């Protein structure tokens, strides 16, 4: 089980990423634009660096919905491998059954 503080930190990161998404995309467009002058690019880089660190989407971590576990996450179900196996063994995941060959 993940600490409550880690789960709360992820919630804050998601909110910050949503808040600064448009600003971040705008600055990145200026930086990657061929038509921008060097000075405009440099100013855009400085502004991008001044944004909060947690506003970057790459800082987010996908976590299990039940436990908050960050490793072994199965995106299709939103669960960690452990909780997915438990749910599958109880028959709670339609169409999923234990493999045997």
From Swiss-Prot:
Residues 50-70 are annotated as: Disordered. The keyword RNA-binding applies. InterPro entries: Ribosomal_uS14 (IPR001209), Ribosomal_uS14_bac/plastid (IPR023036), Ribosomal_uS14_CS (IPR018271). It comes from the Bacteria. Binds 16S rRNA, required for the assembly of 30S particles and may also be responsible for determining the conformation of the 16S rRNA at the A site. HAMAP family: Ribosomal_uS14_1 (MF_00537). Part of the 30S ribosomal subunit. Contacts proteins S3 and S10. This is Small ribosomal subunit protein uS14. It comes from Erwinia tasmaniensis (strain DSM 17950 / CFBP 7177 / CIP 109463 / NCPPB 4357 / Et1/99). The lineage of its organism: Bacteria, Pseudomonadati, Pseudomonadota, Gammaproteobacteria, Enterobacterales. The gene is rpsN.
């Amino acid at each position: 089980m993940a600490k409550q503080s880690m789960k709360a930190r992820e919630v804050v990161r998601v909110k910050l990423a949503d808040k600064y998404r448009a600003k971040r995309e705008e600055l990145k467009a200026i930086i990657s634009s061929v038509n921008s002058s060097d000075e405009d690019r440099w100013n855009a880089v400085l502004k991008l660096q001044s944004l909060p660190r947690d506003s970057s989407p790459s800082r987010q971590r996908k976590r299990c919905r039940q436990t908050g576990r960050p490793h072994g996450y199965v995106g299709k179900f939103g669960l960690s491998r452990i909780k997915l196996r438990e749910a599958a063994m109880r028959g709670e995941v339609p169409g999923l059954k234990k493999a045997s060959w």
